[in-house]
Amino acid sequence: MSFTFGQPSTSGASGQSNTSTAPASGGLFGSTTGSSTPAFSFGNTSGTQSGSLFGGATTGQKTSLFGNTSSTTPAGTPATSLFGQSTSSSSGPSLFGNASKPSGNLFGNTSTSAAGSSTPAGTPSLFGSKTATTSAGASSTTPAATAGSGSLFGSTTATTQGSSTPTSTGLFGGSSTASKSLFGSTTTPATGTSGSQTTPAKPLFGSFGSTTPAGAPPTDATKTAGLFGNLSKPATTGTSTPTLFGSTSATTQGQSSTPLFGAKPAETSTTTAASGAATPATSAPASTTPTLFGGATLTSSAPAASTSTSTATASTPAATKPLFGATATTSAPGSSTTTATPGLFSTTPATTAAAGSSTATSTLFGTKPATTTAAAASSTPAATSTPSLFGSKPASTTAPASGTPTTTTAPASTSAPATTTAAPTSGASATASTTTAGQDAKTTTAGLGASTVGPQSQLPRLKNKTMDEIITRWATDLAKYQKEFKEQAAKVMEWDRLLVENGEKIQKLYTSTYEAERASNEIERQLSNVESQQEELTAWLDRYERELDELYAKQMGSAAGEQAAGPDQERERTYKLAEKLTDQLDEMGKDLAKMIKEINDMSNTLSKGSKPDDPLTQIVRVLNGHLAQLQWIDTNAAALQAKVAAAQKAAGSMGANVPGTETDAAESFYRSYRGGLK
């Protein structure tokens, strides 16, 4: 195909065998007649005539810019002009976005086409008109229509379920199924019988789009939030694209968008495929995009299994984070990989309940990554999070039992409570929603519409700083670290010295313990020796007592023997007592002799040392003389008394023989004795 300003002719199969060539879009200055190979021109090159610049069209001619009407073709549908005039030709889009079948006007009039017709879908208008939707029945043979290009303000074009042609995106962010508008118009897809959906092109600025699921979910559609949170309910589950001020659309099988400050979206609705279509095993979840100030989104759940004949595998697209900490949640049927881009102030990354791994990127002020709940039969997921500037807590992974999906809630860094359905957020507060997922799905990566923005830089403190400031700060930090290192080194040195001293003390204690052990062993040996000696002495005493008992038995004898031996024992005791007294008397005599000898020696010493004319000596000598005379008198008196007694005894015997003489003799004796004394 050569260069042209019109849209080329495309064709797509919707699951049936019959196909038809889709009409091309109108050129700038009109359309040309059909040709197999278009050359370089400014008009349309398909068989069907397209709208001209000013929207007027005749049979087989192009439509002018302002919608002039002419004759119509029999099978065509009238196209509207700029201000709503209806034409009868099957014209292509004009400069301001008239639909090809039918053409839309400037302010978004909508025309429909009958189900089962082979007319293609049109191109959106300037301000987001809604084009016709083609509904394919169970037995329809209508071919797939070409996807219309996105207008300036994001009109929605009709899409067919079985279309394989990617749709072009709008100016500020395309979506997975159809082009997106700037102010959030809505697209309504057509229900096809079977087929697969392709991935659309990435939008111009790349951070707002998301991809459609790779499977064949029933009637997937895209819900686009308006500028200030317009609420519109899409036909089926799809992917929502954020607007300029962050309306949030949370879709779970057909939920509507959330306005700017977190209004509750519409309830969910579920659509069923046609009777002749194959029902996929898993329905693709919706990829939600959070708002600017943290509108909360609902969680989307995917069934674990379906009872249809064909099975489709879905992949979960990435969710784009808001600026001030909204919460977006996605769910994948089975194992899927979801990459979340963090917001500016404490957003919570999207949580993916899947059997695969979930990677979350941390935010600037330390958000807590959402938890990943694994529900697969025999696999344990791994959650990886990139640390933030202020120390976010990494994600925690919980692996439940086989076939049992669990729900884990993870609040944001502002300590907002977590719920399992949806919760509105206020300011920088975010609420993490939990998602559950089914089993038996393969792991896929994010689509082309996902954001490719990497994590924020970890060195914001070096921004807008001069080299001197950086070097000064580094020098200050180095000095501080050196001081801390020296302090730590001093502590370590003190600890090392204590360890050395304690080691020496322990060595001394060990030596003392060893010596005490040796001493205790020696004492035990000596005690054993003493114990043996005591045992030996006890043995000898027992033997001596036994021998004494035998000796006493021999000496005492019987009772008669005891009586005979009594006097002998008494004599023996008396003899022993006499010997003892004799020994004591001998000792006493010896002691007295010794005392006398000592006294005499002392007297001699005293007598030798005294002078002859000493009065004391003379007195002693006189006294000694008196003592000697007294002793002599005593001795002679005793002798004389003995003689007198003897004489009296003799005289008594004599007086018995001679009477009368006794008295005279006695008197004479007494007189003589008295005279002698006188």
Curated annotation (Swiss-Prot):
Ranges for the SXFG repeats: 52-55, 64-67, 81-84, 94-97, 125-128, 151-154, 181-184, 388-391
Ranges for the PXFG repeats: 203-206, 259-262, 322-325
Keyword Nucleotide-binding among record annotations: no
Keywords (A to Z) from UniProt: Coiled coil, Membrane, mRNA transport, Nuclear pore complex, Nucleus, Protein transport, Repeat, Translocation, Transport
GO molecular-function terms, A-Z: phospholipid binding; structural constituent of nuclear pore
Localization terms from the record: Nucleus, Nuclear pore complex; Nucleus membrane
Any single biological process term in GO: mRNA transport
Listed GO CC annotations: nuclear membrane; nuclear pore central transport channel
Alphabetical list of InterPro entries matching this protein: NSP1/NUP62, Nucleoporin_FG_rpt, Nucleoporin_NSP1_C
Topology of this chain in the membrane: Peripheral membrane protein
Biased composition (Polar residues): 1-23, 38-52, 59-68, 100-109, 174-183, 233-245
UniProt remark on domains: Contains FG repeats. FG repeats are interaction sites for karyopherins (importins, exportins) and form probably an affinity gradient, guiding the transport proteins unidirectionally with their cargo through the NPC. FG repeat regions are highly flexible and lack ordered secondary structure. The overall conservation of FG repeats regarding exact sequence, spacing, and repeat unit length is limited. FG repeat types and their physico-chemical environment change across the NPC from the nucleoplasmic to the cytoplasmic side.
UniProt family annotation: Belongs to the nucleoporin NSP1/NUP62 family.
PANTHER family documented for this protein: NUCLEAR PORE GLYCOPROTEIN P62 (PTHR12084:SF0), NUCLEAR PORE GLYCOPROTEIN P62-RELATED (PTHR12084)
Chain's role: Functions as a component of the nuclear pore complex (NPC). NPC components, collectively referred to as nucleoporins (NUPs), can play the role of both NPC structural components and of docking or interaction partners for transiently associated nuclear transport factors. Active directional transport is assured by both, a Phe-Gly (FG) repeat affinity gradient for these transport factors across the NPC and a transport cofactor concentration gradient across the nuclear envelope (GSP1 and GSP2 GTPases associated predominantly with GTP in the nucleus, with GDP in the cytoplasm).
Protein name per Swiss-Prot or TrEMBL: Nucleoporin NSP1
Name of the gene encoding the protein in the UniProt record: NSP1
